[in-house]
Regions:
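Short loop/turn segments that flank or connect secondary-structure elements
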Residues: 1-226
Length: 226
């Protein structure tokens, strides 16, 4: 999702790499789950996220659509996002994966395979011509006395360099699609979105995600940018 605020308004002003040490760890959150009580459908899911959810829950994309995820328009493109459910005893909504009972009450039910957006929070990415940097968002996480840790440890993603290359490739591809969409009529915009969903989300990935994704991306570019 695009945001219009300036970098100075949103961040602490620093630009970080995966090996930078930042004060970001809330020490297990200790009963806080405000970031899971979102009011808008802002947790957009990329292909890696969907692959992780599908494998972690043992469900297909179509099965996830029954409860866990939904489709929405994000800056002109139809993309999946985490579903939100109404709170049982209060007003507002929370993430469908926020535990509501027992020892998992107030805890993430999919923490080991949570989406990239959730792993990154309260950090973000600043995309520039040569790649991207990590940034620390201000006033996003209310937890006090955060501990220092490396960005790499905070993300907790295996093969992080490969993941970062994928993230940059996906971001660049989606940005190019967004540039192209205004030139299309409404019917063609719908067709492009459905083509993207079918190509990158609906069809299950092979065991080697990055290789499979690369092959799909090459084919899609050949169709859309020929």
């Amino acid at each position: 999702m695009l945001r219009n605020e300036s970098l100075e308004e949103l961040t602490d002003g620093g630009k970080y790499t995966a090996d930078s040490v930042v004060k970001v760890d809330p020490d297990g959150c200790r009963g806080c789950h405000l970031c899971c009580e979102v009011v808008e459908d802002t947790i957009i899911l990329d292909p890696y996220d969907i692959c992780a959810l599908a494998r972690g829950l043992g469900k297909s994309f179509q099965e996830l659509m029954q409860r866990e995820i939904a489709l929405g328009v994000c800056d002109g493109i139809i993309l999946p996002h985490l579903n939100l459910v109404e709170k049982e005893n209060a007003s507002g909504r929370h993430c469908v994966f926020l535990g509501q009972e027992g020892e998992m009450q107030g805890r993430c039910l999919i923490h080991s395979f949570r989406p990239g957006f959730c792993r990154l929070f309260p950090m973000g990415r600043l995309y520039e011509e040569e790649g991207f940097s990590y940034v620390l968002l201000k006033n996003e996480c209310p937890y006090q006395d955060k501990k220092e840790c490396s960005v790499r440890a905070w993300l907790g993603i295996e093969e992080l360099e490969q993941y970062e290359a994928y993230v940059l490739e996906w971001h660049s591809f989606i940005a190019r699609i967004r540039e192209q969409l205004p030139q299309e009529n409404e019917e063609d915009r719908q067709k492009i979105s459905l083509f993207l969903l079918q190509s990158f989300y609906l069809t299950p990935y092979r065991e080697g995600f990055y290789e499979d994704f690369g092959e799909r991306l090459k084919k899609v570019k050949g169709v859309l940018f020929a």
